[in-house]
Amino acid sequence: MKKIALLSSTIAFGLFEPEHRDARTFSYEKVASTADLSHFTLDYALLLQALTDQHCLPTLVAWNDPHIDWRAFDAVLIHSPWDYYEHQDAFLNVLRDIETHTVVLNSWKTVAWNSDKKYLQDLSDAGIPIIPSAFINVAKTPDILAALPNYNWTQGYVFKPTVSAGASNVFVITSSEQAAKIYTQYFLNKHNTLLVQPFMEEIRTEGEWSLIFFEGHYSHGVLKKAEAENIWVKHSMENQKHLPDESLIKASVAIYQRLIALRQDSPLYTRIDVIKRIEGLCVMEVEQIEPYLYLHAKADAAKKLVAGIIKRL
């Protein structure tokens, strides 16, 4: 039986009962029924089920637990280390150390690149379409207003650190006064680089698509929308009725292939978030660390992911 560590964090542990952290006492039905239909927890259950079906023993472990013997695992799957961005250097050092003992998926090389949103500049330089993005060196920019790109205040500016995850320190700015206040309070002397982007109204109208790839092949896609007056996109059962059409899949595959050519890498999993604009698809983000993979959105998605893990052992 192959032992698979699911790399997590103590933050994520709160979502799971202790008996669900080790597949030896795992019950898919119990997790699914007590998960309050949380997509994340349901996907965790699907992953555990797929692993155990293939005679693997998955165990949830904290990335910064000093007592873990990584040699005891046949592979380490990065799963839910939600606090990694607060300890980027330490997290990457741990991954580099783990790779000397066992297989890490995705690899340190992939994660190191993807952990800083300055990767968007690499994509743009390679001709991959991204939404407009400006990177501001905080240490050299005491006055944010003098450095802001010429976006539309009515549309709004999005401020976020380049090393971040989820909604942490993400703001929509609609005035110069707000920009100066937020920059001083949340970014100055606290972060190295500020990412500034225009707010994309498409996430409220048509929505944002997440396209998921396993082992170099397109698997499935889901539509997410932000509610009115909100900037956070989410996948709902209503949105699940919408499937990407062939033209969207074809365009996303082309973006993925250009990404792989750029990186000369072979990640196990990749999620590409895009919006549709008049000029075509634009990349919002590429997720290769601990993305939510929407395994519940396609019947064989978890099986495909696990097949990729086993292939690399």
PLM feature spans:
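Active-site nucleotide/adenylate-binding loops and adjacent lid/helix of ATP-dependent enzymes
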Residues: 2-9, 13-16, 95-101, 105, ...
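Short hydrophobic segments within beta-strands
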Residues: 7-9, 79, 214
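Conserved N-proximal alpha/beta basic substrate-recognition cap immediately N-terminal to
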Residues: 11-13, 18-137
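Short secondary-structure junctions
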Residues: 56, 128-129, 153, 261-268
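A short beta-strand motif that forms the metal-chelation/ATP-contact edge
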Residues: 73-78, 210-213, 280-292
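Glycine-rich phosphate/pyrophosphate-binding beta-alpha loops
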Residues: 82, 167, 227-229, 287-297
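Phosphate-binding site of ATP-dependent enzymes
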Residues: 171-262, 275, 281-282
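ATP-dependent carboxylate activation and anion-phosphoryl transfer catalytic cores
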Residues: 247-313
